[in-house]
A protein has these predicted regions:
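Beta-hairpin "wing" of winged helix-turn-helix
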Residues: 23-24, 28, 56-65, 69-72
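Extreme N-terminal segment that seeds HTH/winged-HTH DNA-binding domains in transcriptional regulators
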Residues: 1-30, 34-35, 79, 85-120
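Short alpha-helical linear motifs
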Residues: 52-57, 73, 106-107
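Hydrophobic alpha-helical segments
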Residues: 9, 44-47, 64, 95
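N-terminal helix-turn-helix
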Residues: 29-62
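Short, charge-rich, low-complexity interaction segments located
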Residues: 66-84
Length: 120
């Protein structure tokens, strides 16, 4: 894993992406901390920190003796948080940069429409 975020945060975001892509479904068992540690070549305690982030957010729940499972509505919770926090922050940063560069609202909206078009 590469980036400026801690490895356990990157791993929890990877798990979120797996959930968003529906590779893990509601009430399905998720990877154990040991499986994740092996997959990402990290310490199991680090993997556990990433899992705990999602458990603290209600994305995962624990079944005693069985492991961690995906909560109902987990995908919707992730989408809501990312849309209302992550995406909003990114848009605000783009708007600030556009202002610095003298890009007006109409031009910026045009750029966003262009970027959102599917590739031919």
């Amino acid at each position: 894993m590469v980036g400026d975020k801690p490895i356990y945060v990157q791993m929890s975001e990877w798990l979120e992406n797996e959930i968003l892509c529906e590779r893990i479904r509601e009430n399905e068992k998720v990877y154990s901390q040991y499986q994740l540690a092996e997959m990402f070549n990290i310490n199991p305690a680090t993997a556990a920190k990433g899992i705990n982030i999602l458990a603290d957010q209600g994305i995962l729940y624990k079944k005693r003796g069985l492991g961690m499972f995906l909560s109902a509505k987990a995908k919707e919770k992730i989408q809501y948080r990312r849309k209302n926090h992550t995406l909003k922050k990114l848009v605000e940063e783009v708007v600030v940069e556009a202002r610095r560069l003298g890009v007006d609202e109409e031009e910026l909206i045009g750029m966003m429409r262009e970027a959102s078009r599917p590739d031919p």
